[in-house]
Amino acid sequence: MVEPREQFFQDLLSAVDQQMDTVKNDIKDIMKEKTSFMVSFENFIERYDTMEKNIQDLQNKYEEMAANLMTVMTDTKIQLGAIIAQLEILMINGTPLPAKKTTIKEAMPLPLSNTNNEQTSPPASGKTSETPKKNPTNAMFFTRSEWASSNTFREKFLTPEIQAILDEQFANKTGIERLHAEGLYMWRTQFSDEQKKMVKEMMKK
């Protein structure tokens, strides 16, 4: 027969063993959860790295598109300035610049517009006009720096009277912005309907 004291220790050891088994099982569960968490965390890090790379790629593409857009806008402004400048030359000189495959002798004079501004008349009966003209140099031979300078262009092609009108209208503008504004103003106010029609026909060639 087991003595009470010995039975007590046996029961105590059995309880301790059961408690140890419980602790071991809890530790196993914790390790499984840790492993699962680490896998999930690694997957998250991988997705984050992929997302960060995609964001960087998008940013690079955006910067490239912005640079390309700025280049296109600059070139467009220069080309628009060239077109506006040639329209002003047409109005001031009364003779269109030669179109492609057309010689200067073949170019027909534009009719005078109904304005109070002084404009030169096309030569008649082989006689040259007594009114002094501005230099009709083809504006397409201008350099980019000249396109950017409204004053350079205006001194070469515009009469003092028209320059005074434009100075009053666009005193707050400079450079290409002013050149565009002057060209649009003159196109809208100085060109006759017939002149506009002829210019549009020329630009289609």
Swiss-Prot record:
GO terms (BP aspect): symbiont-mediated activation of host autophagy
Chief subcellular location: host cell
Location of this chain's protein in the cell: Host cytoplasm
Domain of life: Viruses
Coiled-coil ranges from the UniProt annotation: 10-75
One term under GO cellular component: host cell cytoplasm
Swiss-Prot/TrEMBL keywords: Activation of host autophagy by virus, Coiled coil, Host cytoplasm, Host-virus interaction
Entry keyword annotation includes Coiled coil: yes
Induction: Expressed in the early phase of the viral replicative cycle.
Region described as Disordered: spans on this chain: 111-138
Record's compositionally biased regions (Polar residues): 112-138
Bridged cysteine pairs (disulfide): none
Protein family (similarity comment): Belongs to the asfivirus K205R family.
Known function: Induces host endoplasmic reticulum stress and consequently activates autophagy and NF-kappa-B signaling pathway. In turn, may induce autophagy-mediated STING1 degradation and innate immune evasion.
Protein name: Uncharacterized protein K205R
Species for this entry: African swine fever virus (isolate Tick/South Africa/Pretoriuskop Pr4/1996)
